[in-house]
Amino acid sequence: MLSAKKSLTLALVVPHVLLYAQTRALAFIEPKSNKKRYTSLPNYSLQTWNMDCHTLLKGSVVLRYKLTSMKEDNEVLLLKGNEAIARAAIRCGCDGYFGYPITPQSEVLETLAELKPWETTGMVVLQAESEVASINMLYGGGGTGKRVMTSSSSPGVALMQEGISYMAGAEIPGLIVNVQRGGPGLGTIQPSQSDYNQATRGGGNGDYNVIVLAPASVQEMADFVDLAFTLAFKYRNPAMILSDGVIGQMMEKVVLPPFKPRRTEEEIAEECPWAANGHGLKKRGPQVITSLELEPTKMEIKNLHLQEKYRQIKENEVRYETQQLDDAEYVIVAFGSAARISQKAMETARKQGLKVGLFRPITLWPFPEQQLREIAQRVKGFLVVEINAGQMIFDVKLAVEGKVPVEHYGRLGGIVPNPDEIIEALKKLQK
């Protein structure tokens, strides 16, 4: 377990590691001189210097760069979900990635290593020695106000839970990507959705929540990276993209957004006055970033503050998608890849005369309970489809409040349900 002293040390040391790695791929300009000093790097080309270039500060040295390999327009590519995550991270102004390879998400790290963003945007990419190390690097980098992220799969994310709890308690923003596989234990490398409870209930110790986004396409894998960072920094809270092996490995057309410039140290100091940036740019006095508070009264106040923040997130950030609900008598509730399969089941069932609709939660936390509660007043029942033994069904039941039946259909062991199985489950619900 990290002590408060070690946690603070990480928060202070990691930004210098980030800046050191950034400077390897940059040219230098001293603020009091017009002379330019260029680093010598292979396969690296600098464009004309201008005032539109991204600006970094390291002590009294101003670093500006603009690179020829950065495409400013949208780009359309055929990508795996994992590859889309990596490319979107580079384009959304991510400062650093710290991860460890594990099937079925290893392509995230592999793609970043292949693209070498440290030579284009200055983004740091580091393979940590373990998942435990990577989440604590996230703590340190996020504590400096940087946009930092990690990715893993179910057993690896389980190892990160202590660090995620620390980040939530210290109110440090950051992005965790979980490309789920089957469990428990080492389980299988096949897809699953069995980490729902862990993600939505706060898998570590204490009363906390993580903002959870569930993509159902490769396009959403890309789109949710920037969205997750935006929400994480808006609320000073960890955010998670909860995907699975199906979405991570499937290939689809993706429209990647234009490059968003990484923020300067001055911009970070302005936007994140709480950050330990180490540059003397803070807008207020010394700030200790920690989840530790030994005085019970102060700890209660801190927890009440967190709960108020979570209330605001619930009020403002619920996201969901609906299909064919206008005349629906029964509603399938599913997220991620299970929602894609359920959509096909819904379309086939309607051809057979069944009035079925689809409700897809996009934010698993905050969960769209009020929306489901309203739908329950006009339908006859819900079928919750998951690739697990039944986890989201409890949130659906809480939302419906017993007004109509709520049943579950799922497959285990890395096996995904097929549309015909879902239709049979719908017919049983009708009886």
Positions of PLM-derived features:
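Glycine-/acidic-rich phosphate or pyrophosphate-binding loops and their flanking alpha/beta elements
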Residues: 80-84, 307-330, 343
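Thiamine diphosphate
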Residues: 107-201, 211-233
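Structural signature of the thiamine diphosphate
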Residues: 210-267, 381, 421-431
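Conformationally flexible catalytic loops at phosphate/diphosphate-handling active centers
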Residues: 236-322
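Generic long, charged, amphipathic alpha-helical segments
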Residues: 342-375
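Peripheral docking tails and interdomain loops at the edges
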Residues: 386-431
